[in-house]
């Protein structure tokens, strides 16, 4: 009997809690059901137009320009700001806006997930003809402003430029110690929570129930990183001392870890890092260009220019080797160049002769027996000059500038030229025949 009374009391308590939850849900969902079936007007907005309205409104932006290569770094944004908090819900078209008026569980979830801010920016795709959104201010009487704009985005261009530089300099960066430490410290400061969760994951035993906690920790870390980047300006302005302390502590720990393991040494690891940097660079190129066709064309061109470099160089070298070369006339040496080259080559030949005479292959006795002055030959091998001073002076007198040899050559050449010219005037045809008188012939005949 006591057990039955206890069971009845517990059942009554559960029914009471269930009834309270149902009443709370009905009271909470009543405001959402009030707009069911209501239809709000849609406000069309254009580039450069500024609209100030109150209460929850529906807006649609019509993109009339067909995207081309000129819109490579063009960004379309719709800026919404107010003095109080507001929420913005982005949809595709008017039909989705009408569905927002009807109550649904998904709408309720999105209502709590969306963050309230004083200012937000909606990025519109160049390829969407129409983009619609709804603005829900926290107070219905609050005045807020909606302004679309189309402009050149310098950040997109910088992302594209960073991707191109990273792709082409991936091989150099993968072997650089400066890049190793700077990338390690940057990764540690940006993803410190992710790294901490990964370290905890390494120490957890297998089949541990904490794996679900780790998965939730990864999601929470990503949310924290996104939240920090969204409020980075506020953090650097109001909490700059905490930001400096975080950068100093986490940066030092990251540097210590990078210094402990050191830069990559194995060639395969360096190649893997280089490939990863190239892939990341191509992703940055794709993210920095609004027009997909232009992005793919630049990515393919960059890939071909980097990886087809070696085949093109090989083909170019083969073409130059197989192509017949034109023989260019050799330049004659000047007198100073001839004198300098002769001295260098003479000294080189003498050194080679000394080395050969000192080698085991040299037959010393046979050579000495044929020499008139063996002592002079021995002095030459030991490093003495191969000519005596008087021999040098005699050579200069005979063969130097102004020597007897050059004078004989000059004068003999002039005389021989004159003789050749004189001899050249007389030929066999010019020889006169002998003429005899008839008397002499008769005398001889007798």
Swiss-Prot record:
Disruption phenotype: No discernible effect on morphology, viability or fecundity. Simultaneous knockout of nemp1 and nemp2 results in viable healthy animals but both females and males have impaired fertility with females laying normal-sized clutches only for the first 3 weeks followed by a marked drop in fertility. GO terms for biological process: erythrocyte enucleation; erythrocyte maturation; oocyte maturation. GO terms for cellular component: nuclear envelope; nuclear inner membrane. It is found in: Nucleus inner membrane. Residues 410-446 are annotated as: Disordered. Residues 1-37 form the signal peptide. InterPro entries: NEMP_fam. Belongs to the NEMP family. This is Nuclear envelope integral membrane protein 1. It comes from Danio rerio (Zebrafish).
């Amino acid at each position: 009997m006591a057990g039955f009374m206890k069971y009845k009391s517990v059942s009554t308590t559960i029914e009471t809690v269930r009834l309270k939850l149902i009443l709370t849900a009905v009271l909470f969902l009543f405001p959402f059901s009030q707009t069911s079936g209501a239809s709000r007007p849609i406000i069309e907005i254009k580039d450069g137009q500024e609209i100030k309205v109150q209460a929850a409104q529906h807006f649609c932006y019509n993109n009339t320009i067909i995207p081309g290569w000129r819109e490579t770094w063009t960004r379309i944004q719709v800026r919404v700001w107010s003095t109080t908090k507001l929420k913005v819900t982005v949809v595709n078209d008017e039909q989705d806006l009408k569905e927002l008026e009807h109550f649904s569980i998904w709408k309720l979830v999105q209502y709590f997930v969306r963050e309230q801010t004083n200012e937000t920016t909606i990025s519109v795709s160049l390829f969407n003809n129409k983009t619609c959104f709804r603005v829900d201010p926290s107070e219905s009487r609050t005045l807020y402003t909606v302004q679309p704009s189309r402009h050149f985005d310098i950040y997109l261009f910088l992302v594209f430029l960073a991707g191109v530089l990273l792709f082409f300099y991936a091989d150099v960066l993968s072997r650089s110690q400066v890049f190793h430490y700077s990338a390690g410290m940057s990764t540690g400061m940006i993803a410190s929570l992710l790294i901490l969760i990964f370290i905890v994951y390494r120490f957890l035993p297998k089949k541990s129930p904490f794996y679900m906690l780790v998965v939730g920790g990864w999601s929470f870390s990503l949310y924290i990183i996104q939240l920090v980047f969204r409020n980075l300006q506020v953090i650097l302005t109001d909490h700059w001392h905490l930001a400096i302390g975080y950068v100093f502590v986490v940066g030092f720990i990251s540097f210590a870890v990078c210094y402990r393991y050191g830069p990559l040494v194995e060639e395969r690891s360096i190649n893997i890092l280089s490939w990863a940097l190239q892939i990341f660079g191509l992703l940055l190129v794709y993210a920095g260009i609004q027009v997909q066709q232009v992005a793919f064309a630049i990515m393919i061109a960059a890939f071909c220019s980097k990886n087809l470099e070696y085949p093109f160089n090989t083909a170019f070298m083969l073409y130059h080797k197989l192509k017949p070369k034109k023989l260019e006339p050799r330049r004659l040496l000047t007198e100073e160049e001839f004198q300098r080259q002769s001295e260098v080559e003479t000294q080189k030949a003498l050194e080679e002769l000394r080395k050969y005479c000192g080698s085991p292959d040299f037959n010393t006795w046979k050579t000495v027996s044929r020499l008139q002055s063996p002592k002079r030959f021995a002095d030459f091998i030991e490093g003495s000059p191969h000519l005596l001073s008087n021999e040098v002076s005699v050579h200069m007198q005979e063969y130097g500038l102004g020597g007897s040899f050059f004078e004989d050559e000059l004068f003999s050449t002039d005389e021989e030229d004159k003789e050749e010219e004189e001899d050249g005037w007389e030929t066999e045809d010019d020889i006169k025949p002998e003429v005899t008188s008839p008397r002499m012939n008769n005398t001889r005949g007798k």
